Curated annotation (Swiss-Prot):
Residue segments, region Pyrophosphorylase: 1-229
Domain of life per record: Bacteria
One MF annotation (Gene Ontology) recorded for this entry: UDP-N-acetylglucosamine diphosphorylase activity
Organism of provenance: Staphylococcus epidermidis
Protein name (record): Bifunctional protein GlmU
Function summary: Catalyzes the last two sequential reactions in the de novo biosynthetic pathway for UDP-N-acetylglucosamine (UDP-GlcNAc). The C-terminal domain catalyzes the transfer of acetyl group from acetyl coenzyme A to glucosamine-1-phosphate (GlcN-1-P) to produce N-acetylglucosamine-1-phosphate (GlcNAc-1-P), which is converted into UDP-GlcNAc by the transfer of uridine 5-monophosphate (from uridine 5-triphosphate), a reaction catalyzed by the N-terminal domain.
InterPro entries noted in UniProt: Bifunctional_GlmU, GlmU-like, GlmU_C_LbH, Hexapep, Hexapep_transf_CS, NTP_transferase_dom, Nucleotide-diphossugar_trans, Trimer_LpxA-like_sf
Cofactor binding note from Swiss-Prot or TrEMBL: Binds 1 Mg(2+) ion per subunit.
Amino acid sequence: MQRHAIILAAGKGTRMKSKKYKVLHEVAGKPMVEHVLNNVKQAGVDQIVTIIGHGAESVKDTLGNQSLYSFQDKQLGTAHAVKMAHEHLADKEGTTLVVCGDTPLITYQTLQSLIEHHESTQSHVTVLSASTINPYGYGRIIRNHNGILERIVEEKDANDSERAIKEISSGIFAFNNRVLFEKLEQVKNDNAQGEYYLPDVLSLILKDGGKAEVYCTEDFDEIIGVNDRLMLSEAEKALQQRINRYHMENGVTIIDPSSTFIGTDVKIGIDTTIEPGVRIGGHTTIEEDVWIGQYSEINNSTIHSNANIKQSVINDSIVGENXXVGPFAQLRPGSNLGSEVKVGNFVEVKKADIKDGAKVSHLSYIGDAEIGERTNIGCGSITVNYDGANKFKTIVGKDAFIGCNTNLIAPVTVGNHTLIAAGSTITDNIPEDSLALARARQVNKEGYLKK
């Protein structure tokens, strides 16, 4: 059976009080609508249509070709929004999932179960529900005395007894696609808001003797719709708890989960320890037995086994096995550290390959460079890679010793097994097995200050 999905992402989100459109606000480092789309895809949907309106181009830029798009010029309610997908789906067979783009906590497992329940019961519509102590703001699930679904009533249209009901509609539905688009033509806007409500499709199906089901999720957090900054922070907290719990259940020690922020695409090996205040995002892979010290930040990087990261920032880089970074080091994009490499305190590395066993222990800048195996870069040494217009490369061979406070003026090559005296400014290539000195000779004038 064909499976389709419609993601509702046309709203501006005025309660956010933001220049950014609502569904593009991030949770765990990713726009809410992207979380939704990823989970819809994993649920086994063949085709996705995203309804866009406010911020249409920004939403399309975010989701790219992972979705088809339909434009809703005026936001006249959820049924009106779904109707906009007519051009792509009206003649299709199968099941259509409708999900809101501001529900970043929904999981693909729940969506999958909803679809399977809908199809196995041969229903025309199935609504995803949940129960909560505080149902304010949500549509209520109205059942008859036999527990059979009768209708969904919106908060603003509910009477006092209906508002007391704790089971609420998530706003997520599975429909028989043909029935959905047939009934959308019959929906009217005679309600308190003057809008076309998607739950009215359910009422029309029931009125004509169709079959409607409810699938209830036990985790209310999954269906949280984010409408303001407070709810955004609640969604962030809930998703971080879920992510951190997953990693801890799979062998990772997180000393203080409440202050640790890990993205959804991060992979972490067993027996890795993460101290408080750490942020790990993007497509980062951390292997086994890694120690990540407090307040470190790692993005889109690979950290190999037994590495030790202390209070450092790492972006788009690779750290080899048994390497040590920090404290207070920065690896900028393109940094590649081999095994047993040490990058110490207040060292900045950018677009550089530092080979196995090399050391850059303190107060240095290594940019656009290649540092050979077991080479030692002394304190305060820098690669001078920029002339104001272009970047140039520095190559240092293996087993070299670069004295403290050395300036390597690129482009320059330092051979294997060389020694550069402290305080030198190197402008020419150095052959291997050489000693290089490039500094003024010291002159002492005794008694000068007694004059």
